[in-house]
UniProtKB/Swiss-Prot annotation:
ATP 1 binds at residues 648-655. Its main location: membrane. Glycans are attached at residues 386, 510, 615, 691, 790, 815, 923, 1007, 1355. This is ATP-binding cassette transporter abc4. InterPro entries: AAA+_ATPase (IPR003593), ABC1_TM_dom (IPR011527), ABC1_TM_sf (IPR036640), ABC_transporter-like_ATP-bd (IPR003439), ABC_transporter-like_CS (IPR017871), ABC_transporter_C-like (IPR050173), P-loop_NTPase (IPR027417). It is found in: Vacuole membrane. The chain crosses the membrane at residues 21-40, 55-74, 94-114, 121-141, 160-180, 189-209, 296-316, 337-357, 412-432, 441-461, 524-544, 553-573, 894-914, 936-956, 1009-1029, 1033-1053, 1065-1085, 1120-1140, 1148-1168. GO terms for molecular function: ABC-type xenobiotic transporter activity; ATP binding; ATP hydrolysis activity; ATPase-coupled transmembrane transporter activity. The keyword Transferase does not apply. It comes from Schizosaccharomyces pombe (strain 972 / ATCC 24843) (Fission yeast). GO terms for biological process: glutathione transmembrane import into vacuole; phytochelatin 2 import into vacuole; response to toxic substance; transmembrane transport.
Length: 1469
């Protein structure tokens, strides 16, 4: 027989002779290495092989020795300790089995050595000795592992390595000859050798199924291993079998968090945060690559292998079609190509899954690292009064919800670097082998294609940046409006605010559509040009070169051109992604590198250090402008362990002084000092409370000491309040303490500062929201108690009289300057005291009241339901097609949706017809050499042009419909949220709502429509593949149905698990945003208490919970992929086998069928994956729909309209009114009867919880009316449209809210009034006389209409905000005014001025004032006294005083007296 080594290899990919020395050469990419395969077992090549085997075995032994020496030097035998798991028994059993196999292998090798029974390839003595040495080493390693426990892992790894080195030569020896038609019979191998081969294979596969040993990364955490860490390598890297329990659980019931595998310790947040801090560089891009280089390297290697394996299928297709065209000329067994059609997709899938596994691991790790760094930056940053930081709440939310996800997509950068060049270059090389120089024609057009996204890249970057800015703007506005939703509802501003959000949403959508159109044009162009490149190549090949196009050439070329088209499509997509990635990296990097941070605190103990300022000047911003407020030339030293008070007029800088001492201001010159070694506690002017229980807010993560806790509760006057709560101190208070009154919030914040074991306590006007009784109680039982002994207390207050005797040091602040008052007889103090509230209050001795059981015993309170915030609802069950059609209905009319679907069908049908036409053309070329190629080329080109046009129309019509759907869904949810009851916001954290408008809307905008598009395409590809192949090979329907059923089964299991996990991800994302927003608002308090580490840990734990679910979600994708890939990979092989056995099929039909079979097999997995991703993204659609169907406040009706002049006068009547906050809630106001005459000034007084605020809310219809009627100007309020009612009543809350913008936009947010009127309102309220800052020459800068307002008015003092709220009420010119202690935070001089303004500006208006300071309402027309929801007294204050009732006792406690009225009597209720 002819020597096969010098036999020409004839085919599409190899030309010439191949030397025998070339063995598996990667340089011959076209598998010409097959030419070295011998046709018989006894070919000379096998006799030349022993040296190759010998060197391999000897090299393996050397590597093994080096490995063992390295492990010994690194003390692996003595330091490492393994941790047991539930698989320990299985691990031991596998170890014993491997030991037995090593004995058997040694015995068989020794037997062959003695009896000279080695095969020819192993008969050389050196090789025999090496193999025997290997057997001895294997036996020794397994034996040592049985008796030497500390070294077991190292020895085990060495044995596995040794086993693995044996497999290639032995496997090659047995499989080598069967690659050829004339292979030797199986009987030529003895059973002994087959058994030898078998135990070699088993010895290598057992380690794959052996559970692994776990080494804890953080032994101190007492952390249990994740299933991912102890399962076998096969379950970990191949089958993902450790997720089987989760998948089976999801089949039976709804998935819970505890059903998912715990997060591995190497993926915990603290591990990656530590690495980031250690490897941090100024460039975030470089830092990311330094930290995650292993994942990036793994992605690069696996991506390269995917590219290489991709070519196995087209090579096999070419050779199989070549065999069918000329069976006699083929020497290679055609079953080899069938096997290659199976192994090609299998290997591609294996490396693809490994690539995806590494990339999703990078995704999860980069997410947890960057999000934690953003939060850490938030904790360090200055937010208050920073103009550049107005939007930091929304900006931080957007960085986490958008930019961090975009940075995670940097993994796709590997695609352009590795995979695209390899596949494009490989395809061009193989096309050149197939089509000669005509392939370079296509290459030229391909280069042109490549330039399109590069040229348009800057434009895409610009459009992307503009769209992102629009998204930021919308999210920032939404965050601000949701933070102040109650003031919006108080004023009836829902509809105008809706319009503002919708305008920003429209800008965002317009910019997004421009970007989308650009992407569509690039995508269609990039996908179409490779197709026309293929057309041009065929034209040159057939007409100019005069070659005949055969099925093996045509369909292989189509596959290769599809590779090029796919890669350039990816390039077009990734060019936009890369632009977005670098934009996001820049945004996150700018945020993290922002130098505006507070100074690190000094915790060094130094008792000699003084507390105060030393020639210090400070501002809120790092680079102040002339108009910015400044504390100037401060020289103040506060005495240690004494009480100091800070006084001054409203807006003078008192709160800034305290913030400066805490390090919240930027130091421009001088120095300041606040020792932190023994801790600092701080009570802000606006109390900051966490969304937690009362007890958690007071403890603030300090240990619970029962005795001290009881004393603090008693000292802060909280006993009565706790008795009124259902679960006492275990009652949840909601976001920002929304369920509490202003006084209750202030006292809880005070209790937190008093309970903490700190030596320094800073308090900012803690008495502003307290009534006289409570103020005096706290002064007596808190400030003068043992709780405050040996503590340095610095208190900002207007109650000078209360602390005059006990204060050791007094500081006066005026216009940013401060100086001490050394003489208590100073005229300044005299004036302050005269202006202060009248006198101390004699309160009942609450000390005699025992602390109730709820405070004594936490267990008793646990039995009661103190929960306020409802858990986020989860939609359960599978997402059905009705929901998908429900989403598509938002595209437009039914006709429009039908037209879009028709474009999908016709585009897919055209694609199939193109391949069918190629089959018809190539068959004609084979049967008739003189075929008219021009006719076929013309039809072929026309079809390609039609396909490109249909593709464009399909994409544009679909994306436009999705754009409309996004707009409608956003607006529907927006209107629903703004139209729901105010009580819903008490139960729903703002972060949860923001998450719906940020992450879920983004999902609908970007992901949902894309996955639906992809799912429809995949479905049509599957259906088209089945119909196409079955039409030529009907028997193919059987395996196709089996594959579809198997795909459906695995897809069903997978989808139920994945959708459940995705829904959990959505739920566990909201707490991250909630804690972020909560921390930004209270960051100064967190820093003052030095609780940054605790809050970082809380955030880290929430991140770990989220990453646990995200990793499970990613790995579930791998779970289904390996199963569906394994099944669908059989399809191509089965189709090839059918074609081989079915002799009557022409090569063209076979090529068409195999091409469609490959498309079908790949589309099955893609369809399962896309359906899952679609269902997961539909979760966002469900969540948006959920918030679009919230219970709504009554909608406006024609009957509810009122004249523009209504009410002409403020006549108010309550007729037997009883209300509650919900239909099932307790009655708050009980049978209230009263009549308020027009223009009367009525004060509402009573103890905390008596129902004062509820009365005002009832007038605005914020409560549930149980019975009775309320009339305003003779009209029942229930019959008036809600927005009209609230717009005609002005409400001035205790905690005023300002919106970002200017003073003008806050007074007149809808530009309806002239500046003259607005300036008059500023002047009347006194706001225009307030000083914001000073210029460099000390000239004051007053508040004007153009004064900048930061988010929530953070650049104004609390008193200034209350005055601006008064100005806003003046602008509204309402006939009814409700004031809820609106002067609590102003000094008494300003209070008196405001009271005068109220009487003058609202002389003809009816005023309802909820008051704590009795002196401010002594000249009111009437007073109503509420007690536990009952109106107990109502009448003129002098009359009530002399009735000796509730009001008299309150006046006596305040030192207020009234002269006897000339006429007694009152209009009783």
């Amino acid at each position: 027989m002819e020597n096969f080594h010098h036999r020409p290899f004839k085919g599409g990919f190899g030309v010439g002779r191949v030397p025998t020395s070339l063995y598996y050469s990667l340089s011959d990419f076209s598998l010409s290495a097959i030419s070295i395969f011998p046709t018989h077992y006894d070919q000379p090549y096998l006799n030349e092989a022993p040296s190759w085997y010998k060197y391999s075995l000897e090299s393996g032994l050397v590597c093994l020795y080096l490995y063992l020496i390295y492990r010994w030097i690194t003390r692996s035998f003595t330091v490492k300790q393994t941790v047991g798991s539930e698989f320990s028994g299985l691990r031991k059993a596998h170890g014993i089995l491997l030991w037995l196999l090593s004995i058997l292998f040694l015995g068989m090798t020794a037997f062959m050595f003695v009896n000279d029974a080695f095969p020819t390839a192993f008969s050389d003595p050196p090789v025999k000795i090496c193999l025997l040495a290997y057997s001895v080493h294997l036996f020794l390693l397994h034996s040592l592992r049985m008796i030497y426990p500390r070294a077991r892992p190292t020895l085990y790894h060495a044995a596995v390595l040794l086993n693995l080195l044996l497999l290639p030569p032995i496997f090659h020896f047995y499989s080598y000859p069967f690659f050829f038609v004339d292979h030797p019979p199986l009987s030529s191998y003895s059973p002994f050798l087959w058994f030898y081969f078998f135990i070699t294979i088993v010895g290598n596969f057992i380690p794959l199924f052996t559970p692994r040993v776990w080494y804890p990364l953080f032994p101190e955490d007492n952390y249990q291993p994740s299933a991912e860490q102890v399962c076998s390598m096969f379950n970990f890297a191949c089958s993902y079998g450790y997720l089987n329990p989760l998948v089976l659980t999801a089949k039976r019931r709804v998935v819970e968090v505890d059903d998912t595998p715990v997060i591995p310790d190497y993926d915990k947040n603290k591990a990656w945060t530590y690495r980031f801090e250690r490897m941090k560089t100024p460039s975030l891009f470089i830092t990311i690559h330094k930290i995650f280089w292993r994942q990036i390297l793994g992605m690069g290697v696996s991506s390269f292998m995917v590219s290489v394996c991709q070519f196995l299928s087209p090579i096999a297709l070419n050779r199989l079609l070549k065999h069918l065209e000329s069976p006699s000329s083929s020497s290679v067994n055609p079953l080899v190509w069938i096997v290659l059609l199976l192994t090609g997709p299998f290997l591609t899938s294996l490396f693809t899954q490994f690539y995806l596994f590494m990339s999703t691991r990078y995704l999860a790790r980069s997410y947890t690292t960057l999000v934690q760094q953003i939060y850490n930056k938030v904790i360090r940053s200055r937010f208050v009064q920073n103009k550049s930081g107005d939007s930091k709440v929304g900006r931080s939310n957007n960085l986490i919800s958008t930019d961090v996800d975009d940075i995670g997509e940097i993994r796709e950068f590997i695609h352009i670097i590795v995979r695209a060049p390899v596949e494009i270059a490989g395809s061009i090389y193989l096309l050149q082998k197939l089509l000669g120089w005509s392939a370079y024609v296509g290459l030229a057009l391909t280069v042109l294609t490549c330039s399109v996204p590069i040229v348009l890249g800057p434009l895409v970057a610009k459009l992307t940046l503009r769209a992102n800015r629009a998204t930021d703007s919308r999210i920032e506005l939404m965050s601000e409006l949701l933070q102040s939703i109650r003031i919006t509802k108080f004023f009836g501003w829902e509809l105008p605010m809706l319009d503002r959000v919708k305008q920003r949403r429209q800008v965002e959508l317009n910019r997004t559509w421009k970007l989308l159109l650009m992407e569509i044009c690039i995508q269609v162009l990039v996908e179409s040009l490779p197709v026309f490149s293929m057309f041009a190549t065929f034209v040159v090949f057939t007409t100019i070169m005069g070659q005949t196009i055969t099925p093996s050439i045509a369909f292989t070329s189509i596959s290769l051109f599809s590779f090029i088209r796919t890669q350039f499509s990816w390039i077009a997509y990734l060019m936009r992604q890369i632009v977005q990635i670098f934009v996001s990296i820049g945004r996150v990097s700018d945020f993290l590198n922002d130098p505006d941070e507070v100074d690190p605190v000094n915790t060094i103990e130094d008792t000699s250090q003084e507390i105060g300022f030393f020639n210090a000047s400070l501002t809120w911003v790092s680079n102040p402008s002339p108009g910015d407020f400044c504390l100037r030339d401060l020289n103040i030293v506060f005495p240690r362990n004494k009480l100091s008070i800070v006084i001054g007029p409203t807006g003078s800088g008192k709160s800034s002084l305290i913030s400066a001492l805490l390090g919240e201001l930027s130091l421009n010159k001088g120095s300041y000092n606040l020792p932190r070694s023994k801790g600092v506690s701080y009570v802000s002017q606006v109390p900051w409370l966490r969304n937690a229980t009362i007890r958690d807010n007071i403890l603030f993560d300090y240990p619970y000491i029962e005795e001290r806790y009881k004393k603090v509760i008693q000292a802060c006057g909280l006993l009565t309040d706790l008795q009124s709560f259902v679960a006492s101190d275990l009652t949840e208070i909601g976001e920002k303490g929304v369920t509490l009154s202003g006084g209750q919030k202030q006292r809880i914040a005070l209790a937190r500062a008093v309970y903490s074991p700190t030596s320094i306590v800073l308090m900012d006007d803690v008495f502003s929201a307290l009534d006289i009784h409570t103020s005096n109680w706290i002064y007596k039982h808190c400030f003068q108690s043992s709780l405050m002994e040996n503590r340095t207390v610095i208190l900002v207050t207007h109650n000078v009289h209360l602390f005059m005797d006990s204060a050791a040091f007094i500081v006066t602040v005026k216009n940013g300057s401060a100086f001490p008052v050394t003489d208590k007889s100073s005229p300044l103090l005299f004036l302050a005291e005269q202006a202060a509230s009248a006198s101390e209050a004699a309160a009942p001795d609450l000390a005699a009241i025992p602390i109730p059981n709820e405070v004594d015993d936490a267990e008793a309170a646990d039995e009661k339901d103190g929960k306020l915030v409802e858990e986020e609802q989860r939609v359960t069950g599978d997402v059905v097609f009705s929901e998908i059609f429900s989403y598509m209905k938002h595209f437009g009319s039914g006709f429009y949706v039908a037209a879009v679907l028709l474009f999908f069908v016709t585009t897919q049908a055209t694609s199939i017809l193109i391949d069918l036409w190629v089959a018809f053309w190539t068959n004609s070329s084979v049967n008739s050499p003189d075929v008219n190629n021009n006719k076929f080329l013309f039809v072929y080109g026309t079809m390609l042009l039609a396909y490109s046009l249909l593709d464009f129309l399909r994409t544009v019509s679909y994306d436009r419909g999705a754009w409309w759907a996004s707009r409608k869904l956003h607006d529907s949810m927006l209107e629903s949220v703004f139209g729901t009851f105010a009580s819903w916001f008490d139960k729903t954290p703002t972060g949860r709502i923001v998450n719906r408008f940020a992450k879920d809307i983004r999902s609908i905008d970007m992901n949902l429509s894309g996955w639906l598009f992809f799912s429809i395409n995949c479905f049509l590809s599957v259906a088209g593949g089945i119909l196409s192949v079955s039409s030529a090979m009907p028997i193919f329907m059987i395996p196709a149905v089996i594959v579809c059923l198997a795909g459906y089964y695995f897809g069903l299991l997978y989808t139920r698990a994945q959708v459940g996990v995705k829904r959990l991800i959505s739920i566990y994302t909201s707490p991250i945003f909630s804690l972020l927003g909560e921390s930004i608002v209270g960051v100064s308090v967190i820093r003052a208490f030095n609780r940054q580490t605790i809050f970082k840990q809380m955030f880290s734990e929430r991140l770990d919970n989220l990453v646990r679910l995200q990793s499970t979600s990613y790995n579930l994708n791998r779970w289904v992929a390996v199963r569906t890939d394994g099944i669908s990979g059989l399809v191509g092989a089965i189709a090839g086998l059918i074609a081989l056995l079915q002799k009557d099929l022409s090569p063209g039909v076979v090529g068409f069928s195999l091409n469609q079979a490959v498309i079908f097999s790949s589309s099955v997995l893609l369809f399962v994956r896309s359906c899952n991703s679609l269902q997961a993204e539909m979760n966002s659609y469900e969540r948006v729909l959920e918030y679009s169907k919230l219970p709504q406040e009554p909608a406006p009706t024609i009957a509810g309209q009122v004249p523009a002049t209504w009410p002409k006068e403020g006549d108010i009547v309550f007729n037997h009114v009883s209300v509650s906050y919900s239909a099932a809630g307790p009655t708050i106001l009980k049978d209230v009867n009263l009549h308020i005459n027009p223009s009367e000034k009525v004060a509402v007084v009573g103890r905390t919880g008596s129902g004062k605020s509820t009365l005002g809310l009832t007038l605005l219809r914020f409560t549930h009316r149980i019975s009775g009627e309320i009339y305003i100007n003779g009209r029942e309020t229930q019959s008036v449209n809600l927005n009209a009612l609230r717009q005609r009543i002005s409400f001035i809350p205790q905690d005023p809210i300002l919106f970002s913008g200017t003073v003008r936009s806050n007074l007149d947010p809808f530009d309806e009034l002239e500046d003259n009127f607005l300036n008059e309102a500023l002047k009347t309220s006194g706001a225009s006389s307030m000083i914001m800052a000073h210029t460099d020459d000390q000239k004051p800068i007053h508040i004007t209409l153009d004064t900048h307002v930061a988010s929530e008015g953070s650049n104004f003092s609390q008193g200034q905000k209350q005055v601006l709220a008064l100005a806003r009420a003046i602008v509204r010119r309402s006939k009814i005014i409700i004031l809820d202690e609106c002067t609590a935070s102003v000094d008494d001089a300003m209070d008196q001025k405001i009271q005068k303004t109220l009487r003058e500006a609202f002389g003809d208006a009816t005023m309802l004032c909820i008051a704590h300071r009795l002196k401010t309402i002594v000249d009111y027309d009437k007073v109503m006294v509420l007690d536990k929801g009952v109106l107990v007294e109502y009448g003129p204050p002098a009359v009530l005083y002399h009735n000796n009732g509730h009001f008299r006792r309150m006046c006596d406690g305040s030192g207020i007296t009234f002269l006897p009225p000339e006429t007694r009597g009152s209009k009783s209720a």
